[in-house]
């Protein structure tokens, strides 16, 4: 599927000069509220959430090719970003209904691809929970939903970034060794599926295909994959799509995420960048709540800067240009 000139131009705004997407993710809503609630007894306010996003945007977007924000709390942060930093806006509601089976997708009801574009977005991002082993009844609804969003983005001539998070309802802990064993197939098969032209996806935002905490040499305890098995899963992932794809940081530490990117590259994965969130900014949450705005800025200018600068250094030697796809 060839991209329109408008879509190509928009993705260029989200990338650096080398064609690498070095994007900062701060579209967290539910997860951010939970992180903030760990450090204060009262419920986080809208003002607190918006201000923290603004701080991160003001301090770190000069080092990122683009930033992913949500239109619920992130619009002030989008205005505060560096002039050279592109903008992705999230289209999904945060989280999913834990009382209903299937983790069905849901758009923010007051937004559309048209409205996100009018808000200044260079791309629309949508998060989908997907299990290739779920029932056809569940998965056909998800496929149809993604087809709708893809068609919307084609109509508006705006790039569609699809984020896929895998799960298994029979394995409640997705950080367990049990899930680590099934993760490679679930991640790679979902990528293969949503690379089909009918979905009109332009860039995939994906998990790495293994849990690095269970890889030989990375693991402190149980080993699920040898280094060679893990490397093969990365190669299989690369072969699963013809689309540009970028990795999400999944809340791991900055150091582990950087080591993961090196491992992916050494395995032969031709990934095209990252959308890195908590691995870059999570430490600022506690500082912001306990010590205030100025202390949070100082954290972002030192530790936050080091996290993103180290990541950019790693990307220079590991990621490849999406224009090669």
From Swiss-Prot:
Which one Pfam family would you cite for this protein?
Answer: DeoC
Q: Which UniProt keywords apply?
A: Lactose metabolism, Lyase
GO molecular function list: 6-deoxy-6-sulfofructose-1-phosphate aldolase activity; tagatose-6-phosphate kinase activity; tagatose-bisphosphate aldolase activity
The domain of life for this entry's organism is Bacteria
Q: Name one GO biological process term.
A: lactose catabolic process via tagatose-6-phosphate
Which EC number(s) does the record attach to this protein? 4.1.2.40
Q: Which reaction does it catalyse?
A: D-tagatofuranose 1,6-bisphosphate = D-glyceraldehyde 3-phosphate + dihydroxyacetone phosphate
> Under which pathway is this protein filed?
Carbohydrate metabolism; D-tagatose 6-phosphate degradation; D-glyceraldehyde 3-phosphate and glycerone phosphate from D-tagatose 6-phosphate: step 2/2
Family from the record: Belongs to the aldolase LacD family.
HAMAP family to which the protein is assigned, alphabetical? LacD
> What is the name listed in the Swiss-Prot or TrEMBL entry for this protein?
Tagatose 1,6-diphosphate aldolase
């Amino acid at each position: 599927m060839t991209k329109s000139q408008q879509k190509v131009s928009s993705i260029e705004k989200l990338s650096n000069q080398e064609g690498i997407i070095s994007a900062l993710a701060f579209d967290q809503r539910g997860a951010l509220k939970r992180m903030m609630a760990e450090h204060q007894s009262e419920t986080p306010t809208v003002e607190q959430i918006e201000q923290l996003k603004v701080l991160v945007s003001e301090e770190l977007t000069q080092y990122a090719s683009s930033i992913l924000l949500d239109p619920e709390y992130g619009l002030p942060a989008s205005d505060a970003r560096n002039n050279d930093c592109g903008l992705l806006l999230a289209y999904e509601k945060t989280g999913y209904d834990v009382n209903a089976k299937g983790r069905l997708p849901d758009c923010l009801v007051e937004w559309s691809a048209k409205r996100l574009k009018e808000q200044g977005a260079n791309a629309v991002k949508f998060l989908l929970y997907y299990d290739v082993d779920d029932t056809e009844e569940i998965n056909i609804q998800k496929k149809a939903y993604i087809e709708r969003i893809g068609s919307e983005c084609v109509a508006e001539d705006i790039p569609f970034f699809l984020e896929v998070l895998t799960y298994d309802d029979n394995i409640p802990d997705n950080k367990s060794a049990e899930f680590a064993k099934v993760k490679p197939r679930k991640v790679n098969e979902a990528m293969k599926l949503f690379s089909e032209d009918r979905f009109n996806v332009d860039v995939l935002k994906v998990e790495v295909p293994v849990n690095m905490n269970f890889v030989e040499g990375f693991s402190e305890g149980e080993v699920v994959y040898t280094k060679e098995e893990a490397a093969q899963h990365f190669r299989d992932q690369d072969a699963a799509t013809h689309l540009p794809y970028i990795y999400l940081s999944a809340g791991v530490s900055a150091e582990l995420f950087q080591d993961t990117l090196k491992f992916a590259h050494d395995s032969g994965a031709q990934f095209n960048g990252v959308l890195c969130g908590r691995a870059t900014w999570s430490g600022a949450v506690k500082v912001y709540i306990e010590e205030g705005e100025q202390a949070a800025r100082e954290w972002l200018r030192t530790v936050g800067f080091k996290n993103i600068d180290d990541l950019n250094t790693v990307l220079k030697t590991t990621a490849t240009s999406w224009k090669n796809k």
